Amino acid sequence: IGGKIMGFYMLTTLLAILSSTGIFYVFQPGDPRLASKLTADVSAIASSDVSISIKDTIVNIIPSNFVKPFLESNMLQLIFLAILIGIALGKIGDYSKILKDIFEACNSLFLKITVILVQFIPIATFASVLTVILKTGPDVLLSMLAMLGTFTVGIIVMLGIYCLLILLIGHLTPVPFIKKYSPTMLQVFGLASSNAAIIVNMDACEHKLGIPKKIYSLSIPLGATVNMDGTCIYLVIFGMTLARIFGVEISGGMLLSMFFSVLVLSVGAPGVPGAGLVCLSVLLTQMQVPLAGIGLVMGMDSLLGMMRAMSNSLGDVAASLIVAKSEKILDMDCLLYTSPSPRDT
């Protein structure tokens, strides 16, 4: 069961990255003329015109020292170091538990700091958006609407992909699923957090969709951590849009590097409001895009966070439904009819 759940999560993550990339190239949001208005440092824009080959991407994964990846926020090199340290921890015996506890404590510390800082995002958002509008005029509003519209299309396309997977893999009509889960989707939209949505998703799985506890007790909490399809769409569309605005050339090597970074960031993103903005700043640094463009996104991030959480949760529940059907333990009466099934009586 665990293998099926993880396999489905990896499939939908890949589809989210590929579909959002295609949607970006179709609509191509972002006006390059905004770059000179978003930052006064013209040299920063000129120097950001880089081209990275696939060979360079692979070679540059290995850092020259242990300090440089942290100073440069090089995501691929940090991942390499994390894997290397993890392998080494497994070979040092009893000391590994001590170091593991230290790493977990540091992770909890920085996550708590992030949660505290997120509380100040509305103030920073107001100041940032006001500054950007005063500098750029109405052009920035049109660009923001174009990005929001493109992201919305990405979310709708992902919903269609979930329905298609339910039909093709689960051999179920997606109509009852959407009909039964729609009220919960609105709840998740209001919560704007994958972690906060765990309880309501579990309740929907059991009482509305007929998914047994042995499935959703694993798939929903796991999905809230590793299955972030909405976050993938967000990172790809806004990362590539800001790269286009600032004139950063997206070569094949950079696209490959971005895909890998998006995959890791989406898996590692905490399911709390505002976490997507933090991940986007990391991705922009990796792509050598000036962080001045964050101001374009901050004004919309509360709405974007709600849409991300809704898409993330929809993927988790769709996976639970398909796996339950494949295991032949899905309560079809509960899914297809509004009356309570024998399990609920």
PLM ranges: what are they?
Residues 1, 32, 93-97, 105, ...:
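Juxtamembrane helix-boundary/capping and inter-helix hinge elements in multi-pass membrane proteins
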Residues 337-344:
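Conserved small/polar residues in nucleotide/adenosyl-binding loops
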Residues 54, 73-77, 115-119, 153-154, ...:
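Membrane-interfacial loop-to-helix junctions in multi-pass transporters
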Residues 4-176:
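Signature of multi-pass transmembrane helix bundles
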Residues 21, 83-87, 124-131, 163, ...:
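Transmembrane alpha-helix boundary and packing residues in multipass membrane permease domains
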Residues 184-266, 332-333:
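Helix-loop-helix junctions within the multi-pass membrane cores of secondary transporters/permeases
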Residues 10-14, 18, 152, 156, ...:
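Hydrophobic transmembrane alpha-helical segments of multi-pass transport and channel proteins
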Residues 274-336:
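Hydrophobic alpha-helical transmembrane segments of membrane transport and translocation systems
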